[in-house]
Amino acid sequence: MTKREEYELKAEQLLTPIMEENNFELVDVEYVKEVGNWYLRAYIDKEGGITVDDCEVVSRRFSDLLDEKDFIPDAYILEVSSPGLGRQLKKDKDFKRSLGEEVEIKLYKAINKQKDFEGILTDFDQEKLIIEQADGTTMEFARADIAMVRLALDF
């Protein structure tokens, strides 16, 4: 386990009781370096959508716990926000919630010179995802071959 993964896991453990107390869902936690700064980001959601006030409540509690546990030696910026419209799908609960929705899939390696696919998520399990494309064809992808899945944005 990398340090980054260790920090993300510990952050998830600190966030879990805060999420349960407020009936929020922890969508994702990431510890990343961007433009020379480290960021610890928590993406939260709830039925009906998350508000700025919800993010503030979680941020204050989470910040206090992070200060108390002090497991990240680097300076970092804490951000708590909603996952946004084009949220990535990572966990089974994300896929379950998104059944019947249009998704974008990006693969690590191309299939017939194509890495990007789009379609309606029709099924999934631990090993694979299945989508129905606009032309009605069904495609199955091994989860191990998928770099990223997110909800498709239609404007």
Swiss-Prot record:
* UniProt key word Cytoplasm: yes
Q: Which UniProt keywords apply?
A: Cytoplasm, Ribosome biogenesis
Q: Give any Pfam family that matches.
A: DUF150_C
Q: Where in the cell is it found?
A: Cytoplasm
Classification via InterPro entries: Ribosome_maturation_RimP, RimP_C, RimP_C_sf, RimP_N, RimP_N_sf
Query: What cellular component GO annotations does this protein have?
Result: cytosol
Q: Which GO terms describe its biological process?
A: ribosomal small subunit assembly; translation
Highest taxon listed in the record's lineage? Bacteria
Q: What does this protein do?
A: Required for maturation of 30S ribosomal subunits.
Family the UniProt entry places it in: Belongs to the RimP family.
Stored HAMAP family: RimP
Could you identify this protein by its name? Answer: Ribosome maturation factor RimP
Q: Could you tell me the gene encoding this protein?
A: rimP
